[in-house]
């Protein structure tokens, strides 16, 4: 039996790695896109093109080969072009039946911080904030998120008390004709 493959787009946190590897038996691949965001250029014009191309390069996996993707709040740090590029890559590499977990802030932020999320257990996620050179650049409304992940279905969506929308998307399995 093959272990499910999950990609973590955030900075790998030990407890999350242990949770997916030891508790769930998943192969976890950490693709820390926050490092790319931190080292991105300061020139807004070329930033969009650069980030979009980084998204394509970093997620150069075989189409339909990944069981799950942990996005955390990475989309809050991306402009529209880079976010669309990343979402398209995620949809491309996701297996039918595969899932995407993402967090979207429901309010605008101006302070510069990065949030690292750690899975504590099956019921709890812990967050820790750190200073960073980059602030969240975009607030995603529900309609924008639906468009971003066009082709995936929404499995679950919760608005948390801390004004974060937690969403689980699923790639539909192909229907078989009878």
Give the positions of each predicted feature:
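Residues at alpha-helix caps and immediate loop-helix transition turns in enzyme cores, especially N-
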Residues: 16, 82-83
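A short glycine-rich, Lys/Arg-flanked "PGG" loop and its adjoining helix->strand segment in the class I
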Residues: 84-99
């Amino acid at each position: 039996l093959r272990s499910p493959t999950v990609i973590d787009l955030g900075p790998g946190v030990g407890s999350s790695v242990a949770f997916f590897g030891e508790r769930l038996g998943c192969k976890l691949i950490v693709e820390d896109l926050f490092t790319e965001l931190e080292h991105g250029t300061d020139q807004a014009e070329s930033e969009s093109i650069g980030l979009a191309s980084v998204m394509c390069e970093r997620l150069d996996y075989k189409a339909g080969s990944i069981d799950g993707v942990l996005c955390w709040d990475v989309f809050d740090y991306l402009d529209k072009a880079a976010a669309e590029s990343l979402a398209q890559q995620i949809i491309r590499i996701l297996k039918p039946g595969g899932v995407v977990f993402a967090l979207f802030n429901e309010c605008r932020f101006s302070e510069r911080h990065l949030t690292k999320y750690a899975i504590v257990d099956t019921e709890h996620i812990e967050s820790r904030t750190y200073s960073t050179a980059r602030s969240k650049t975009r607030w995603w409304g529900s309609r924008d998120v639906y468009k971003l992940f066009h082709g995936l279905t929404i499995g679950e969506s919760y608005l948390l008390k801390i004004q974060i929308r937690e969403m689980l998307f699923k790639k539909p399995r192909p229907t078989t004709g009878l």
